[in-house]
From Swiss-Prot:
GO terms for molecular function: copper ion binding; oxidoreductase activity. Predicted to be exported by the Tat system. The position of the signal peptide cleavage has not been experimentally proven. It is found in: Periplasm. Pfam families: Cu-oxidase_2, Cu-oxidase_3. InterPro entries: Cu-oxidase-like_N, Cu-oxidase_C, Cu-oxidase_fam, Cupredoxin, FtsP, TAT_signal. This is Cell division protein FtsP. It comes from Actinobacillus pleuropneumoniae serotype 3 (strain JL03). PANTHER family: BILIRUBIN OXIDASE (PTHR48267:SF1), CUPREDOXIN SUPERFAMILY PROTEIN (PTHR48267). Cell division protein that is required for growth during stress conditions. May be involved in protecting or stabilizing the divisomal assembly under conditions of stress. Residues 1-28 form the signal peptide.
Amino acid sequence: MMNLTRRQLLTRSAVAATMFSAPKTLWAAERQPLKIPPIIDVGRGRPVRLDLRPAQTQFDKGKLVDVWGVNGQYLAPTVRVKSDDFVKLTYVNNLPQTVTMNIQGLLAPTDMIGSIHRKLEAKSSWSPIISIHQPACTCWYHADTMLNSAFQIYRGLAGMWIIEDEQSKKANLPNKYGVNDIPLILQDQQLNKQGVQVLDANQKQFFGKRLFVNGQESAYHQVARGWVRLRIVNASLSRPYQLRLDNDQPLHLIATGVGMLAEPVPLESITLAPSERVEVLVELNEGKTVSLISGQKRDIFYQAKNLFSDDNELTDNVILELRPEGMAAVFSNKPSLPPFATEDFQLKIAEERRLIIRPFDRLINQKRFDPKRIDFNVKQGNVERWYITSDEAVGFTLQGAKFLIETRNRQRLPHKQPAWHDTVWLEKNQEVTLLVRFDHQASAQLPFTFGVSDFMLRDRGAMGQFIVTE
């Protein structure tokens, strides 16, 4: 329990009393319609300009504050591309700091997706031509600047990439962007009295008490009755989310960060590490309001108690309230997914590695990040088995490659179907085994990175570098 001053105690007691006296319907009415990031649909070879520059937003109503963003708004527009296409991309840095960018989940060489060594100085630009050769998935792009990524992401340099292919477009899935195919970028924040973001760079980790989705707090979204698809990106610096629905119905997992499953898998909850993405379906045919939450469902007593808490819990754990409307949908049968290539999962292991992570000591295999050191070299096309343990619960991620989760704590996963990932949550002192596939090259000048997905710890050195050669 925190130590409160008399004034703080009186203020919070008054707020708690108001919470108990206010009808629940009043709280719901105070939620605002969800903001949907604008979308850039990329045709074949169409130029796309992403202007990193200062912007303004209101985290607290009526308090306009300075932030960073892309193309003039807080956060970034969604970029939607097609598989087997290419993108002429231009980043323009109109910020006062050097920035490097990464498209996490996009499988391509570092000269296309970016590297921590591909610096974009202030008032400069970079124009890679990116070839897209992978199945449909949800990626995200974000600042990946050495020693400064957490601050820059927190300020607003983050957005979603969507890759589509012909099979996913033909599948029986909700696909109307912003209508029944909803992008959700999750962030936890801390604000001062003026509504300005607060971040202490000296903290080991960052846990804000307030939850924002697409840059907005306490949002709802009206949808037609039937199935709705949620594309969820954890853009928080340190916080994992335990996704579930408040009415205990399942979330139907259809995709992880680098591809779709063979069929929807109903799950009671899904743990989402920083930088991790999932796609889920929610059934809303009954017409009742359903909330996507993190953690357990809370009642008014819990919310009042949380006002006096000094832990890392969110003040409001409702991510998004879904409000179905209209008649029951004709599209009421469970959606189907695109054809599944089982041969992609027949893997031959070329090598094994063991990674022991001590994130709070900023160490991986007793080594702290050194930008001049390459930790290992992988042959392009190889598959490796990685045994990973961490002495603290933390996310793990890598760039430019993908993996299957083979075991957790030496137990085979109960999932019905395999799925490709680039990020995974590690429980404390539990071994996770990954089968990692390396299909794209990275040079010693522009290496790929691996390490914790907690951006605060990553900036402090809990990461490494590898190259992929022919």
